[in-house]
Regions:
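Conserved NTP-donor binding/palm subdomain of two-metal-ion nucleotidyltransferases/polymerases, i.e.
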Residues: 1-249
Length: 249
């Protein structure tokens, strides 16, 4: 593989927060005869691994993207009631949170590879202990059913899941999945937290740090409105307000 293609692979791995599993795969193959990386390329991967670990600590503390809340107040009250119900099944609640986490990342960052992988791993290891009848009821109560169908289709199309592994899937192939999955190869893909607002001292005007990221977030909100309308609108304004919190008085 050419140096250019290795660079493309590294960019994709960094962008989708899967540097560690990709690097692990590279290490397992390094003994193969036709598999050759220069010392500089190995150093670049090791640097990317270190930066990914450092960034992960900051990234996971971002309360805005946590799965245990929704930005729509009405839906969030329903979610909290579900999570506070001690009689509900723990595995089913865990599955619900994984679906919400993927949905929130889709709205704010585009298709999230790492989060989809986590959902897929849980499905293959713990699906037998999930009450899918209750889960579907919760998803409909939270208006999440349609975007959950998109997640099912992405798992089948991108990661080779079979229909029998997707108890939630309604059997209807999503026609938009190829267009949605195109985000995976867009190097201009930007995260919602890549833009924030600031105000210079002595200046009454507020400006954004990354106009392209802000426009990307607007386009993403419009793209996924069909799948989760009740949350998409409030999520956009909540993200906007979250960005305003960076303003230095």
């Amino acid at each position: 593989m050419s140096a250019y293609k290795w660079g493309q692979l590294q960019q994709l791995a960094i962008m989708h927060d899967v540097v560690q599993p990709v690097y692990s795969g590279i290490e397992r193959c390094k003994g193969q005869f036709f598999f050759q990386l220069t010392e500089q390329q190995w150093n670049q991967w090791e640097k990317a691994i270190k930066e990914a670990k450092d960034n992960q600590e900051t990234y996971e503390t971002d309360k805005f993207l946590k799965a245990d809340h929704l930005t729509n107040p009405f839906l969030n009250r329903r979610l909290q009631a579900i999570l506070d119900d001690e009689n509900s099944d723990t595995r089913t609640r865990q599955m619900l949170l994984l679906i919400i986490r993927v949905a929130r990342h889709i709205l704010n960052e585009g298709v999230p590879v790492r989060q989809l992988i986590a959902l897929g791993v849980f499905l293959r290891s713990d699906a037998g202990r999930v009450d899918f009848t209750t889960l579907e009821k919760w998803l409909r109560q939270l208006r999440l059913y349609r975007i959950a169908q998109l997640e099912c289709t992405l798992l089948m199309n991108l990661f080779g899941f079979e229909t029998h592994e997707m108890p939630l899937w309604n059997g209807k192939q999503n026609k938009d999945v190829e267009r949605v999955a195109q985000e995976l190869t867009e190097f201009t893909n930007t995260r919602a937290q890549d833009f924030y607002f600031s105000q210079d001292s002595g200046n009454i005007f507020v400006h954004t740090s990354n106009g392209a990221a802000m426009l990307g977030h607007i386009r993403r909100s419009a793209r996924y409105f069909h799948y989760f309308p009740s949350e998409t609108l409030t999520n956009f304004f909540a993200s906007f307000a979250h960005s305003l919190s960076h303003i230095e008085e």
